[in-house]
Amino acid sequence: MKCRRCKATAVVALPSHNSAFCADCFLEFFSRQVQKGIESHRLMTPEDRVLVALSGGKDSLALMLVLGQLGYNVTGLHIDLAIPDSSPAARGVVERFCTMHGFPLIIRDMDAGGLPIPRVKERLNRPICSACGKIKRYFF
């Protein structure tokens, strides 16, 4: 399979766009798609300050990076949910990413705020994902 733009070997196939791209051309395509979406829906202007919620996963980090590259004034927000098996790793990824790319970062620590997810889960008597969702939805 060949890249739609440069004819190099494609590494990403997008059947919904009837396209395939090499890594470099995909990054350009993705960036253009984000910019088009922002403009067509009038989501923000380059003068706006944008707070991007960062989980530490590829989707939120990719969005933060492309918005920064497009010239938007972005700040990251990470909610440390105090889940012993996953929160320290996610927080570390977000901190390293923001440091590496020079993005400002705000961290809200739910343990320090008296709302660690394991304790909230016990009180709600619900699965941990339910407790996490409630905190993210209603606390912020």
What are these regions (language model features)?
Residues 2-140:
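ATP-dependent adenylation/nucleotidyltransferase module used to activate substrates
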